[in-house]
């Protein structure tokens, strides 16, 4: 299943505690900037200063005399994070956007551990970052972002999109994504919840020289290139008619389905006893919610002692849900990328947020190498997440991405 959002021509307001945008390229009649130019580098070194130094050396060897205009990075949460933040902020004077990850995606496909970094060069892509802290203050933060963007009109032919990075342990993504989408309107965005290899211990985001918990950073990119936001998931519905008759969205609990304990109904639909509802089985059969013509995924984390289903995104009382069966993940990606490329051409860069559960399923299916190779061939730079955002939605077990065209 694939959903897309094409770039939008008119732009609306955005935010407050902010870092970055370089000056506008010329006045209101400025011509579009050159095509996007970037380099992806990776270090497995465990010492943060050495890791950053090695990446800076590699970038210098590829682009002697050039400094990046923007940097996006994803890192292992086991680094001493303040030391890493210090090394990054000392080495790079441009806007920085990053967080801890459950693994990275880049030219080498999927990677675990270490530090991955995307350096963007030239004036074809600009980045400004906006802090939302704490996550619960989403609405007031979005108002500040909106005012900041309204004060910065775009040159003709330029557009904006967003990349949201949010602490994956504070369960505020639904409210945050909704606030951003409705508060900014014409800024399509994707996002990912910071991860830590499923340890669920510490998943901070980076802003202005340090890593911050219970926070989010909204990166606003400006470009004259065509782009498209899209998402891909590979689950097909079983055609079960299930009604959520009791839920606790704040705690992401589904308590009853069709008036019975949720675990009982779920297991019955799968034709198995409740006792065998293992993490692997739950991951293979998430809940599916229909929104218009699209299906969105709600991953199930575990069955509680009270026989409720603890989900990784909120589910409301009264909604109709189905149960998904896993289809072919690689083929779903191929269809998604084919559709996007038919509209904007071959991308110069794809920023991607891919659920850690998708990677785990690929490992179990012996497909990790093939899927990683596919993403590398399609110039994806991104990370494995605790959850994904797509415009106003917080979802699970999905690949969300922004593809930037090689041509304007």
What label would you give each PLM region?
Residues 2-408:
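Hydrophobic alpha/beta core scaffold segments
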